[in-house]
Swiss-Prot record:
<dbReference type="InterPro" id="IPR003372">
    <property type="entry name" value="PSII_PsbL"/>
</dbReference>
<keyword id="KW-0604">Photosystem II</keyword>
<dbReference type="GO" id="GO:0015979">
    <property type="term" value="P:photosynthesis"/>
</dbReference>
<keyword id="KW-0934">Plastid</keyword>
<comment type="subunit">
    <text>PSII is composed of 1 copy each of membrane proteins PsbA, PsbB, PsbC, PsbD, PsbE, PsbF, PsbH, PsbI, PsbJ, PsbK, PsbL, PsbM, PsbT, PsbX, PsbY, PsbZ, Psb30/Ycf12, at least 3 peripheral proteins of the oxygen-evolving complex and a large number of cofactors. It forms dimeric complexes.</text>
</comment>
<comment type="similarity">
    <text>Belongs to the PsbL family.</text>
</comment>
<keyword id="KW-1133">Transmembrane helix</keyword>
<keyword id="KW-0602">Photosynthesis</keyword>
<dbReference type="GO" id="GO:0009539">
    <property type="term" value="C:photosystem II reaction center"/>
</dbReference>
<comment type="function">
    <text>One of the components of the core complex of photosystem II (PSII). PSII is a light-driven water:plastoquinone oxidoreductase that uses light energy to abstract electrons from H(2)O, generating O(2) and a proton gradient subsequently used for ATP formation. It consists of a core antenna complex that captures photons, and an electron transfer chain that converts photonic excitation into a charge separation. This subunit is found at the monomer-monomer interface and is required for correct PSII assembly and/or dimerization.</text>
</comment>
<dbReference type="InterPro" id="IPR037266">
    <property type="entry name" value="PSII_PsbL_sf"/>
</dbReference>
<keyword id="KW-0194">Cyanelle</keyword>
<keyword id="KW-0793">Thylakoid</keyword>
<keyword id="KW-0472">Membrane</keyword>
<feature type="transmembrane region" description="Helical">
    <location>
        <begin position="17"/>
        <end position="37"/>
    </location>
</feature>
<dbReference type="GO" id="GO:0033115">
    <property type="term" value="C:cyanelle thylakoid membrane"/>
</dbReference>
<keyword id="KW-0812">Transmembrane</keyword>
Length: 38
C-alpha cells in the first residue's frame, strides 16, 4: 500500500497517540479520585 502523502499518516498517528494519551489521563484521574474519596 503506497502512500502518496506521508505527512497525512504522521498527522493521523499524532492524533491517535493524543487520543490514547487523553484517555489514559482520564482513566488515571478517575482511579485517583476514587482512591482519594474512599
Amino acid at each position: 500500500m503506497v502512500s502518496q502523502n506521508p505527512n497525512r499518516q504522521k498527522v493521523e498517528l499524532n492524533r491517535t497517540s493524543l487520543f490514547w494519551g487523553l484517555l489514559l489521563i482520564f482513566v488515571l484521574a478517575i482511579l485517583f479520585s476514587s482512591y482519594i474519596f474512599n
